């Protein structure tokens, strides 16, 4: 391997150099080609992996399970009600137990400090499947997808805008990733929903070294002009109370990704991205609740954008598996 990432934790992109991040993306691209070409080699044969999910999941769980199986590993799924973590046993103790039984551990849950503690005490590679603050595996998939659809541009030649709640784990993680990789990111959101100032300051310092361009703006037209990609996420994050909806919908409606926003980029080839799940119609229980309460069939993105030729959300979702596989192979593989 070009880089020795063996036995490293994957907790947040702040812990990695641009070259290490690019290596994992390149490895994911190679692994994807190998899977499609029928010549994939197993690098995790005989490995046992624990998947801790304190929050529910579709893409992250399936991506970890399929990636592990493809590479010859076995997994144990510990769901929100399937363990003693946090109830009868501390994460510190859990880490020291699971680290004796498993070769690698994935964690999806709440505070970043929890996965950091798990990583500090497990003694085996720990991978962050999502916390309230960061979602690093998603960013690898996003950047891989941008490379696939970027018409030959390197990451440091790509401009993209993130619209909506920019203080959540996706806003944080995209900003960190863009800073590391020298990209042009525009965080387009109400000022109250910009990332924490200390994280912005860290990213601006990184940007001084990488040439990244970080813009925080409330102006949608300014933020999206010339963008290669538009990105959004749900307006109310996992675990937030439903009572937050009323104020959030009122504040965020101007930042909805609709065809007017697509056209405002002045880029006919602009692509739309979303980490999913998305509220783009009224065909789900929550989507119907939103439609009934607010008279909107889509929230952060409209149906016509989501289903348009601009949308690459399902390529992006697939790449979760390939990039997660790359992280596991890089940190645990033979």
UniProtKB/Swiss-Prot annotation:
Short name of one Pfam family: OTCace_N
Pathway per the UniProt entry: Amino-acid biosynthesis; L-arginine biosynthesis; L-arginine from L-ornithine and carbamoyl phosphate: step 1/3
SUPFAM superfamilies for this protein: Aspartate/ornithine carbamoyltransferase
Binding site for L-ornithine: 169, 233, 237-238
GO molecular function per UniProt: amino acid binding; ornithine carbamoyltransferase activity
Function, as annotated: Reversibly catalyzes the transfer of the carbamoyl group from carbamoyl phosphate (CP) to the N(epsilon) atom of ornithine (ORN) to produce L-citrulline.
Protein's recorded name: Ornithine carbamoyltransferase
Name of the gene this protein is made from: argF
């Amino acid at each position: 391997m070009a880089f020795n990432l063996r036995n490293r934790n994957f907790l947040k992109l702040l812990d990695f150099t641009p070259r290490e991040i690019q290596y994992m993306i390149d490895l994911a691209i190679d692994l994807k080609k190998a899977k499609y070409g029928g010549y994939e080699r197993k690098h995790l044969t005989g490995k046992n992996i624990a998947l801790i999910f304190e929050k529910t999941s579709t893409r992250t769980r399936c991506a970890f399970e399929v990636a592990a199986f493809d590479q010859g590993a076995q997994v144990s799924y510990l769901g929100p009600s399937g363990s003693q973590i946090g109830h009868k046993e501390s994460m510190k103790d859990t880490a020291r137990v699971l680290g004796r039984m498993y070769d690698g551990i994935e964690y999806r849950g709440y505070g970043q400090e929890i996965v950091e503690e798990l990583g500090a005490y497990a003694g085996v590679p720990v991978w962050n499947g999502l916390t309230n603050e960061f979602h690093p595996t998603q960013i690898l998939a996003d950047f891989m997808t941008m490379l696939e659809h970027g018409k030959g541009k390197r990451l440091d030649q790509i401009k993209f805008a993130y619209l909506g709640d920019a203080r959540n784990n996706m806003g944080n993680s995209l900003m960190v990733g863009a800073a590391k990789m020298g990209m042009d990111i525009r965080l387009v959101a109400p000022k109250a929903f910009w990332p924490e100032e200390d994280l912005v300051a860290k990213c601006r310092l990184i940007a001084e070294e990488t040439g990244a361009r970080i813009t925080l703006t409330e102006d949608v037209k300014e933020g999206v002009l010339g963008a290669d990609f538009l990105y959004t996420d749900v307006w109310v994050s996992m675990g937030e109370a439903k009572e937050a909806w009323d104020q959030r919908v009122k504040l965020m409606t101007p930042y909805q990704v609709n065809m007017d926003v697509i056209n405002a980029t002045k880029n006919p080839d602009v692509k739309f991205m979303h980490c999913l799940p998305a509220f783009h119609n009224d065909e789900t229980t929550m989507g119907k609740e939103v439609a009934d309460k607010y008279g909107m069939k889509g929230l952060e993105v409209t149906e016509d954008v989501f289903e348009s030729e601009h949308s690459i959300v399902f390529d992006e979702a697939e790449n979760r598996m390939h990039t997660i596989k790359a992280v596991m192979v890089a940190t645990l593989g033979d």
